[in-house]
């Protein structure tokens, strides 16, 4: 799973199901693909979204700011700063400062995420606030690791009351990851289609998959509903590859 796919998965796992979730997923995809580079417009759009909690808005604002190329002197947004202040709890801030110092020594995403997961969501949010206000003091990978760790803590707390898990991965995150990977596979099919004779068939399968993922996000579905979604799509992709006489192992 690529870094941006992982970030998209974790961030979407804390967004409530509904039409807005599908819209946010599309914005994230566009931002990560470099198709949306107007940070000011993005932040203004995010600030006025209903339903989302201040913390979720803060996390999304942090991700947008981290990803979209912007002027060095760009003004920080108050709604992001307020959301990432650890609820004003001095204990959260103390822990955030300690974590921030540790993160400055980390260079890999997974190393930083492992360190971050030992802290509470409040301390992690405060740490994000420190990084947001001094953007550039840690690497982008490390900053994304803090985002994913925070979302994992939030998703865990949301799910803990009825969680009976064999693995440590949260079902909400697994569910979101299946949908993100299905979208990615659909994109791969569209790119492969080109102008071949079977292009219409490939485009149709990919289009149906994308519509299904959008619908699942918009109406809200239980975590088990996405099981097999990516696998079904990959089977279609592999059958298409076979007919075309090509092998695209990297999409597996």
Curated annotation (Swiss-Prot):
Single Gene Ontology BP annotation: viral budding from plasma membrane
* Keyword RNA-binding tagged: yes
* Membrane topology label: Peripheral membrane protein
What Gene Ontology terms describe where this protein resides (cellular component)? host cell nucleus; membrane; virion membrane
One MF term in the entry's GO annotations: structural constituent of virion
> Could you share any additional remarks the record makes about this protein?
Most abundant protein in virion. When expressed alone can form virus-like particles in transfected cells.
Can you say what this protein is called? Matrix protein 1
- Organism of provenance: Influenza A virus (strain A/Korea/426/1968 H2N2)
User: Source gene?
Assistant: M
């Amino acid at each position: 799973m690529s870094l941006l796919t992982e970030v998209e998965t974790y961030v979407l796992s804390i967004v409530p199901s509904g039409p807005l979730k599908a819209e946010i997923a599309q914005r994230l995809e566009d931002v990560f693909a470099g198709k949306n580079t107007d940070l000011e417009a993005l932040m203004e759009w995010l600030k006025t979204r209903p339903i989302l909690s201040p913390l979720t808005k803060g996390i999304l604002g942090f991700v947008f700011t981290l990803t979209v190329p912007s002027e060095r002197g760009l003004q920080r947004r108050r709604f992001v700063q307020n959301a990432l202040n650890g609820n004003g709890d001095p204990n959260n801030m103390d822990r955030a400062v300690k974590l921030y110092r540790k993160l400055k020594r980390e260079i890999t995403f997974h190393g930083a995420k492992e360190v971050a997961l030992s802290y509470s969501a409040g301390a992690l949010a405060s740490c994000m606030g420190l990084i947001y206000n001094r953007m550039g003091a840690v690497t982008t990978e490390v900053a994304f690791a803090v985002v994913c760790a925070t979302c994992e803590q939030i998703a865990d707390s949301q799910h803990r009351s009825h969680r009976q898990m064999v693995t440590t991965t949260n079902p909400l995150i697994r569910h979101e990851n299946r949908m993100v990977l299905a979208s990615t596979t659909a994109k791969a099919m569209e790119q492969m289609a080109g102008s071949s004779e079977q292009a219409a068939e490939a485009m149709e399968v990919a289009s149906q998959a994308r519509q299904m993922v959008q619908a699942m996000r918009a109406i809200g579905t239980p975590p088990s509903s996405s099981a097999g979604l990516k696998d079904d799509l990959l089977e279609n992709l592999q059958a298409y590859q076979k007919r075309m006489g090509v092998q695209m192992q990297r999409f597996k």
